[in-house]
Amino acid sequence: MRTLWRFIAGFFKWTWRVLNFVREMVLNLFFIFLVLVGVGIWMQIGNGSNSEQTARGALLLDISGVIVDKPSTNHRLGALGRQLFGASSDRLQENSLFDIVNAIRQAKDDRNITGIVLDLKNFTGADQPSMRYIGKALREFRDSGKPVFAVGENYSQGQYYLASFANKIWLSPQGQVDLHGFATNGLYYKTLLDKLKVSTHVFRVGTYKSAVEPFIRDDMSPAAREADSRWIGELWQNYLHTVSANRQISPQQLFPGAQAIIDGLTSVGGDTAKYALDHKLVDALASSADVEKALTKQFGWSKTENNYRAISYYDYSLKTPADTGGTIAVIFANGAIMDGEETPGNVGGDTTASQIRDARLDPKVKAIVLRVNSPGGSVNASEVIRAELAAARAAGKPVVVSMGGMAASGGYWISTPANYIVASPSTLTGSIGIFGVINTVENSLSSIGVHSDGVSTSPLADISMTKALSPEVQQMMQLSIEYGYKRFITLVADARKRTPEQIDKIAQGHVWTGEDAKANGLVDSLGDFDDAVAKAAELAKLKQWHLDYYQDEPTVLDMVMDSMTGSVRAMLPEAIQAMLPAPLVSAANTVKAEGDKLAAFNDPQNRYAFCLTCANVR
């Protein structure tokens, strides 16, 4: 027995030594890892601070990923994280719209930057107002006498929109300019819910409030189809007008229609590159070697980089503007509006309201610009933000709303207290309506022999997804939705100096482009972020000003954790997608996007001012 106990004691002693060794090894490795991260960040910052062109050359706009108003990670820290952890998915990278525009404007006045090269092969998307704003900066750069060149093996619609602002567009002899138009695509679940015996209870106000249709239909309603066809057609016409004007051709020549394109391709034997050249979509067909030769002639040769002389946007150091004059606070509402604190890619009602409060209480802040790029979301969170913005205005601080790609439904709700609203012609706004959806599974459970029962002190207390909603609960829910809609209408009417009846005619969940919103009196003027800032300065009577962007900079630990998890997110989908046919990959991405939308539904009263179709444009 003593031998047995000695054996057991020895086993546990040996096990403890192994575990202790592993513990110490992990801690030491983690310490070394943190040292390497610190050194890497120091080197990155050091390189960034000396990254201005010391020799004359181009600014290479090699944008990778998507362009958003407010990235979740600083692009320099994000780049370092990808190098350290090997995240390879460009789709995960977010780029700041304002950093890009500021880089172009700084390059315009930088004597060492003699041109811009747009290399957009890894650029995966942005809303039209954002690209229009970048295009404005590119046009300013060109007007200064410096050229802009676009190079690409192929151009997607978004890539080509930006490329059209260049002096010259090169296309690979085997390439294509992929113009096909816009579409909205959503998933509809009625048959699935019926098969699962899920009971869907819908509460809504607004003829065109189609956000609930996926739960109660298998296709679009005629009203939703008519409404979406109108605004998506306007977006496409805006696209054609801008790009054709840049290329100095007619919209008809740019996109003559599906059959005409097929006929044109047939005439050149299916050669998409020749078709693009013949129709003046591009200026020249050239291999990568020929493009390199031309750019070397333009900008010179770098022996150290073994390429034409250029500095990447990601290495180009942005100067911090001097804090002169009064402060204009810039606060972002970027993404779906959720109750509570902010999460990456979403607007937290409490977080945004806190930022507005800080700006209101800061005596140095003379005006507020709220940059809205949101399809809406929680009514409760929207009201929290709106109330704080109204308090800022009541405190004597001018509030100007700058609308980005979307300021719809809840995004418009939070805009109502503004002194002035500026929208882009392609902004999607309006969608003034409210809905709620409650799903119960009593029939699903019953079909497999599971039943729910109990007692309650009133019908209002007996609420569970395992039981059918009582008539009393349904009646209260509908009354709450109707009150919310009346509240929405009243807020808009008071803000726009109209009657509730006048607003109701243009509400009902109707989505409007910025141009239509201006005609309907929902916004004050058409313009961009610069116009909104200028208006804020005018209202605050500032002759000089500087911008203070209210956004939390990620810590080193945030960057480490984000990059580590980002690597996993980047690699797993690619590994899975490699085994799937292309149509299934597209379907999987659509399902993921739908899931992300549903995850944003956390309103405590289950009331939403949300425009689902606004975020579905492809």
UniProtKB/Swiss-Prot annotation:
Cytoplasmic membrane side: 1-24
Annotated GO CC locations: plasma membrane
Active-site residues, record numbering mapped to chain: 209 (proton donor/acceptor), 409 (nucleophile)
Subunit structure: Homotetramer.
Periplasmic side: 46-618
UniProt keyword Transmembrane helix present: yes
Membrane topology qualifier: Single-pass membrane protein
Transmembrane region(s): 25-45
A Gene Ontology biological process term: signal peptide processing
Known role: Digests cleaved signal peptides in vitro, its in vivo function is unknown. This activity is necessary to maintain proper secretion of mature proteins across the membrane.
Designated name of the protein: Protease 4
Annotated EC: 3.4.21.-
Record keywords: Cell inner membrane, Cell membrane, Hydrolase, Membrane, Protease, Serine protease, Transmembrane, Transmembrane helix
Compartments where found: Cell inner membrane
InterPro entries reported for this sequence: ClpP/crotonase-like_dom_sf (IPR029045), Pept_S49_pIV (IPR004634), Pept_S49_SppA (IPR004635), Peptidase_S49 (IPR002142), S49_SppA_1 (IPR033854), S49_SppA_67K_type_N (IPR047217)
Organism in which the protein naturally occurs: Salmonella typhi
Family per similarity comment: Belongs to the peptidase S49 family.
